[in-house]
Amino acid sequence: MGDHHNLTGLPGTSIPPQFNYSQPGTSTGGPLYGGKPSHGLEDIPDVEEYERNLLGAGAGFNLLNVGNMANEFKPIITLDTKPPRDANKSLAFNGGLKLITPKTEVPDEHTPMMSPVNTTTKILQRSGIKMEIPPYLDPDSQDDDPEDGVNYPDPDLFDTKNTNMTEYDLDVLKLGKPAVDEARKKIEVPDASAPPNKIVEYLMYYRTLKESELIQLNAYRTKRNRLSLNLVKNNIDREFDQKACESLVKKLKDKKNDLQNLIDVVLSKGTKYTGCITIPRTLDGRLQVHGRKGFPHVVYGKLWRFNEMTKNETRHVDHCKHAFEMKSDMVCVNPYHYEIVIGTMIVGQRDHDNRDMPPPHQRYHTPGRQDPVDDMSRFIPPASIRPPPMNMHTRPQPMPQQLPSVGATFAHPLPHQAPHNPGVSHPYSIAPQTHYPLNMNPIPQMPQMPQMPPPLHQGYGMNGPSCSSENNNPFHQNHHYNDISHPNHYSYDCGPNLYGFPTPYPDFHHPFNQQPHQPPQLSQNHTSQQGSHQPGHQGQVPNDPPISRPVLQPSTVTLDVFRRYCRQTFGNRFFEGESEQSGAIIRSSNKFIEEFDSPICGVTVVRPRMTDGEVLENIMPEDAPYHDICKFILRLTSESVTFSGEGPEVSDLNEKWGTIVYYEKNLQIGEKKCSRGNFHVDGGFICSENRYSLGLEPNPIREPVAFKVRKAIVDGIRFSYKKDGSVWLQNRMKYPVFVTSGYLDEQSGGLKKDKVHKVYGCASIKTFGFNVSKQIIRDALLSKQMATMYLQGKLTPMNYIYEKKTQEELRREATRTTDSLAKYCCVRVSFCKGFGEAYPERPSIHDCPVWIELKINIAYDFMDSICQYITNCFEPLGMEDFAKLGINVSDD
């Protein structure tokens, strides 16, 4: 027994040969190489000897400072295959020694199971020197300088300012999309009756990571280890969140409903409607937790929703009954009952929040599912609760030097007029300076308004003789004198002769005057009688009937007439290079029909649409659909367009002309600037200045259908920026792409909005034209300003049209947002998968697995220039004007 059981560590036994650990994968602890193994226990390694070596008693492993911490051990750097046995030969690295942890490897049946043949140490070979890297903090993050010949991409770092991520989201990034269920099973979802520590553990798992933690995550993401997502638990912010969470759960232990609401709202991230979660209000309104004070709704908003949040930038939603600003005994701490407000932009809007205001115009916003915030008319109360319009109104004027005598007839209103209070101004007028009643306005003489026969389209024009200068006298309107004694008195320096426009209609009375008009007597005698009429003096009311409009009173004008009015009001700054001739479309073929559309208030546009079954080939008429690119079209039907393949010359300027944003459904993955004339978007892995390779964009929660689409992209598409400012798209795939843009909506004809164009492989199409898009943007913004001036009680050339419109239409036009015009500045492309009416499962492009959006800088710059011009030269709607319109814009 003693011959076969030679165990080391027992008294009187011989010491076997030492193990050599410098050659991973081999062991000399068993029988000799080539020798026949015996049936005894000679091949069992001496575990006790190995443990003594670890403690520094033997010579197998040489530990220099056993008392140091594990991450302070020095590595072993040697020139041969054996570790140094002298402590003085070890070199310092990272300020400490190295602890080698054995790892079991079984290459064959002869190798002992307990043989320590490998370690977790990283061994690098450089210039004949073998260096072992210690596993401190992060085992894969030490080699910031990659090995020779290995090109590692730069790490993907988090945006520490704008990233809202929870610990659960971090686990999803670690495990990937297939293991989402495993991440959910990591912590079981409790209910209100669960132990408090389980609830706190669950709530902390879904807390929002702070900026310091994201910075710490970025610090561990080196070039070698780009996917390191190790979260340090001993963080100061995490300790504070832990205490705040424990304090809230303790306060809600007797309110099971509120506690359950808290669990539900954290799990659903606000998608599920929940009520208020209330805690008692303190004396100073602040909450003290872990030695720090803060407002309760801010503390818990930062805990579960926002990365950064302050009290002055928050407001509560309408359905919150115990908001912090209400000063009630209970304070709601539901993080999804508060929003962050930056100017008029609201972060974190939801469907059930009815107070969302339209966001400001942004060039590089993150589009998602569009909410109906472009129309502020839904904030306007119904007509039943609005103040009635007044028949008389005053306008702020400088004090006249001499006031004429006022007759007794003007001292009291006429029977058909409403009583007038001299001290009350019109409800829609601008803030008053000095007001005078209308019956005290000076009447020095009769001004003569200039005359212009309105060159209107036949379908919208007025029939009847033009009125004489006396008929244009505004003092004869509705049996009372108007205060417009000098038409050019109110003008701006920015526009040439702002109110010196020729008027197609004489009665420029106040827009809110609702006095009925009598039909005119279209005869020469009646015209001569009106022309020979002289107004009364010394306050006498003339007995002649009031001047009225022709029988056919148009409610709209053509686009050409509206643009002429805009030139007279705003100048020619934004109309350079355009002719003033009529833009009316004259039908030259019976192969297409005309449809009437009103894109802006009071203006009618004729849109041609191809008749079903008709075909246009070779030479395209200029009034056909796609008239902007008719010279590049070979064949046109109601279902398809065939381009010739030609186009304008590509721009050779090396400047950033656009931005491409890449999405997978509603999730934005990445973006890249376009700086060359031809810019490619493909599915490869090439980094280039004129190429955006989608294969380089990671997404840990990518869906299987997105994998299939990305695999089919291959050569992708090409955007060509032309010298005339247009953008063309060429499909270089064998699968189709689906394109939509505001420019294509305008060119395709008909009244269908957001029309989807299917572009087959090797085909091209013009997706953006600057000349057409800038006209649409300019007309919409100038129409908005016209409606705003009308609501402010100012004179515009469109007053006679706006009088026929409802207040709802005018307010909708005056509150139009620039975001509603953003579709004329961008192009959206979906790869392989279609959307729209033909695809019920994907009604919007946001439902497509892989799509991109091209934002064109020149269009946004033009929109910005118009907005800045209007802001600097004209008085916008103020807070009082919005209040008079019934729109609540007051601060909470």
From Swiss-Prot:
Annotated region described as Disordered, given as residue ranges: 1-43, 135-161, 505-552
Transmembrane segments: none
Comp. bias regions, Polar residues: 15-26
Family annotation (InterPro entries): Dwarfin (IPR013790), MAD_homology1_Dwarfin-type (IPR003619), MAD_homology_MH1 (IPR013019), SMAD-like_dom_sf (IPR017855), SMAD_dom_Dwarfin-type (IPR001132), SMAD_FHA_dom_sf (IPR008984), SMAD_MH1_sf (IPR036578)
Domain of life per record: Eukaryota
SMART domains referenced in this protein's UniProt entry, alphabetically: DWA, DWB
A Pfam cross-reference name: MH1
Annotated ranges, domain MH2: 657-880
Single GO MF annotation: cis-regulatory region sequence-specific DNA binding
Classification via SUPFAM superfamilies: SMAD MH1 domain, SMAD/FHA domain
Primary localization class, coarse: cytoplasm
CDD domains linked to this entry: MH1_SMAD_4
Domain MH1: 198-347
Keywords per UniProt: Chromosome, Cytoplasm, DNA-binding, Metal-binding, Nucleus, Transcription, Transcription regulation, Zinc
GO CC annotations, alphabetized: condensed chromosome; cytoplasm; heteromeric SMAD protein complex; nucleus
Biased composition (Low complexity): 528-540
Localization: Cytoplasm; Nucleus; Chromosome
Any GO BP annotation: SMAD protein signal transduction
Assembly description: Interacts with R-SMADs daf-8 and daf-14. Interacts with daf-14 in a daf-8 dependent manner. May interact with daf-5.
Function as written in the Swiss-Prot or TrEMBL entry: Transcriptional regulator and common SMAD (co-SMAD), required to regulate entry into a developmentally arrested larval state known as dauer, in response to harsh environmental conditions. Probable component of transcriptional regulatory complex with SMAD protein daf-5. Acts antagonistically to SMAD signaling downstream of TGF-beta-like daf-7 signaling. Binds to the 5'-GTCTG-3' motif found in regulatory regions and may modulate the expression of genes involved in TGF-beta-like daf-7 and Notch lag-2 signaling. May regulate gene expression outside the dauer pathway.
Family membership noted in the UniProt record: Belongs to the dwarfin/SMAD family.
Protein's name in the database: Smad protein daf-3
Classification lineage: Eukaryota, Metazoa, Ecdysozoa, Nematoda, Chromadorea
